[in-house]
Amino acid sequence: MIISRTPVRVSFCGGGTDLPAYYEGSENGGLVTSLALAKHIHVTVNKRFDNSVRVGYSQTEIVDDFEDLEHELVREAMRLTGVTDGVEITTIADIPSRGTGLGSSSALTVGLLNALHTYAGHTPDAAQLAEEACRIEIEAN
């Protein structure tokens, strides 16, 4: 079983200036000041005894094909890492998962990628996780 724990964060200033639409058109670039909190998003990944995919969050999904998952961030992280069958993924948050402004969806995406890459036998570095999570989050919105 793989367990990943990713901190949530609070941004003090500069939110949005780290997006390409801003910093690519600005001669000053972008700068965000934020702080990680002692609250986390926990992700577990474990092998199933069949080829189905089970995802537990505020809901439970069990599908034969990961493409049928409703949870877009989980589905896209699975696609990117190549872990697409015979797996159980569970997410648990120390905070409410919507509307807190603490970057919980970003922390979830990083945690998913970290756990799934590790499950697949890879060791992603922080830059890879950040780039992949950013890509998933931007494409999802």
Pin down the residues of each PLM region.
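ATP-binding N-lobe of GHMP and related small-molecule kinases
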Residues: M1-S104, N114-P124, R135
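Alpha/beta catalytic cores of group-transfer enzymes, especially the acyltransferase/condensing modules
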Residues: P124-N141
